[in-house]
Every structure is written in C-alpha cells, then in structure tokens.
C-alpha cells in the first residue's frame, strides 16, 4: 500500500498575523515614512533627535500595520472577488474579524503610547489622524476618488511632525496649532496628497477589472481612459509643491538632485503604466517608495550641509 500523503501543517498564529499586517511588504510603510521624516527634518531644520526619529519611525510602521487590519476587515466581502486579495487571512477565514480588530487595536494603542511621549498638540492631532485612517476603507463605497481620503490619512504625519518639533509649550488649541504648524507645512501635506493619488491610482489600475465587477469606487475607474495622464499630473504637482516649498525654505543643490532623481523615476514609471498592464502598474506602485526616498534624501543631505 502506498503511504498517505503528509498533510501540511496550518500556519501559526504569528505567521497569520504577519500576513495580516503585510510584514513581508515594507513598501507600504515606507510610502508613509519618507514624507513624514522629510517633514520632521524640515520642521527641526536638521536632525530632529533620536527620540522623535524613533517615535515617528516606529509609529508609522505600527499605524500602517493597524490600518491593514482595519482595511481587511472592512473589505473582506469585496476581497474574496479580487484575484490579488482573495487569500488574505481575514478573507479566507484563517483570522476572525474579532481577532483582526484586536490585533489592530493593540498596534494602534502601541502607536498611541509613542505619541504620548511627545506633547499635547501632537496627541490631539493623533485623533483626527486615526479617524481618517478608519474612514478610508469605507470611502470606497461612496467616494468617487477614495484615494484622496487615503492621501489625507497618509499625509497626516506631516503636521504631526511639525507639532512634535515646534509645539512643546503644552497648549493644544487652534492658536497652538497655527503657531506650531506653518502654512507651508499644510502645503507639504497637499503636495504629498497628490503623490498618494499618483501611486494609489497605479495600485487601483491593477484591480480595475475586478473592482468594476464588485461595484466599489476607485480613482482608476473614475478617471477611465485619462488615468495615465492623471497619474503623471499628480506626480508633477507633488514634485512642484515640495520643490517650491523646499527652495523657499532655502534648500539648494542636494535637494535639487533629490528632486531630479525622483523625476527620473517618475518618467520610468510612465513606461511601466502606459500600457495599463497589471504587472507594470503593480511594479510602479511597489517601487514608488524610492521616489519619496529620493526627495527625503535630498532634504537630509541639504540640511546636513548647513550644520
């Protein structure tokens, strides 16, 4: 008699949780990290100190991971109809809804504990930041461009970085916000929102056929045949906003080199998405964090030369 085939062991809870928070896909939290750290350096006029660097780096990773838990719970009925997401732990039933929410809550509380080591204004800003992050998955049901909601969520680290550096007097009202977060910091937020629109529209282009069938809204569907043109316009607005503000703040040659490196990558991304292939669009999205890194590196080097 032939031996019965050995049954594969089910994945451990730790393995499932790692899948839930996309631990093997750091591109997601890197997309949040570079603009947040860029704002931190600009707010401080250079190196912001190890404490704030640790708070915002760890906080970014934790909140992005918590966001994955919330997103997978909210989208579980949709995800089973999408090729790319059908095997996510919550969608396939390997992790329960309550379990995923518990993991997300623990991660969010850990991030909040880090925020508590900053100041009152930054703590206050963390609440609307959380609200927007929670709202994003549900925006896909009723907003034509839900990527704009994601753009606000992914950009909220910018005003929080300024408040952490400049809002240390204990006040947390509107006057304190205006004093700690200048108008040009909000300009950085708006510019970064356009970057999010660019790369998340590329991401939405991957799933467009599936999304049309299940009836959710995305920027790729809303933009239709103008999607590639719109993505390139979003990139240009992002680089224009950050470039104008950076030069206005006195950044020079190194920052210009960072912008140029980012622009070269954007031009390459156009070659990846112009035919709207799934593989090309997904590759452009997956490598997009290098665009943000180029801008961040230009800021760091330029401010470092001043020191």
Curated annotation (Swiss-Prot):
The keyword Manganese does not apply. GO terms for cellular component: plasma membrane. The keyword Transferase applies. It holds the Pfam family UbiA. One of its GO terms (biological process) is ubiquinone biosynthetic process. Its EC number is 2.5.1.39. It catalyses: all-trans-octaprenyl diphosphate + 4-hydroxybenzoate = 4-hydroxy-3-(all-trans-octaprenyl)benzoate + diphosphate. Pathway: Cofactor biosynthesis; ubiquinone biosynthesis. Catalyzes the prenylation of para-hydroxybenzoate (PHB) with an all-trans polyprenyl group. Mediates the second step in the final reaction sequence of ubiquinone-8 (UQ-8) biosynthesis, which is the condensation of the polyisoprenoid side chain with PHB, generating the first membrane-bound Q intermediate 3-octaprenyl-4-hydroxybenzoate. This is 4-hydroxybenzoate octaprenyltransferase.
């Amino acid at each position: 008699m032939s031996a019965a085939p050995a049954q594969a062991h089910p994945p451990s809870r730790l393995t499932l949780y790692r899948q839930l928070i996309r631990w093997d896909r750091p591109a997601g939290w890197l997309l949040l990290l570079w603009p947040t750290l860029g704002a931190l350096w600009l707010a401080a006029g250079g190196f912001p100190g190890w404490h704030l660097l640790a708070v915002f780096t760890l906080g970014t990773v934790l909140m992005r991971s918590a966001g994955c838990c919330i997103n997978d719970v909210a989208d579980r009925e949709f995800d089973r109809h999408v090729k790319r997401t059908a095997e996510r732990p919550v969608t396939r039933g390997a992790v329960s809804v309550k379990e995923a929410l518990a993991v997300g809550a623990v991660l969010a509380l850990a991030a909040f504990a880090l925020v508590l080591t900053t100041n009152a204004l930054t703590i206050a800003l963390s609440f609307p930041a959380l609200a927007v992050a929670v709202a994003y998955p549900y925006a896909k049901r009723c907003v034509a461009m839900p990527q704009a909601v994601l753009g606000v969520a992914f950009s909220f680290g910018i005003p929080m970085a300024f408040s952490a550096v400049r809002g240390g007097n204990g006040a947390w009202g509107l006057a304190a916000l205006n004093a700690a977060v200048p108008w040009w910091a909000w300009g950085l937020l708006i510019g970064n929102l356009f970057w999010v629109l660019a790369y998340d529209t590329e991401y939405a282009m991957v799933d467009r056929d599936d999304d049309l069938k299940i009836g959710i809204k995305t920027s790729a569907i809303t933009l239709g045949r103008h999607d590639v043109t719109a993505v390139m316009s979003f990139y240009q607005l992002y680089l224009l906003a950050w470039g104008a503000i950076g030069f206005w703040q006195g950044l020079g040659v190194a920052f210009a080199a960072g912008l140029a490196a980012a622009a070269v990558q954007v031009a390459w991304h156009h070659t990846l998405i112009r035919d709207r292939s799934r593989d090309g669009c997904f590759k452009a999205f997956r490598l997009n964090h290098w665009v943000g890194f180029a801008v961040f590196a230009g800021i760091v080097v330029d401010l470092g030369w001043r020191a």
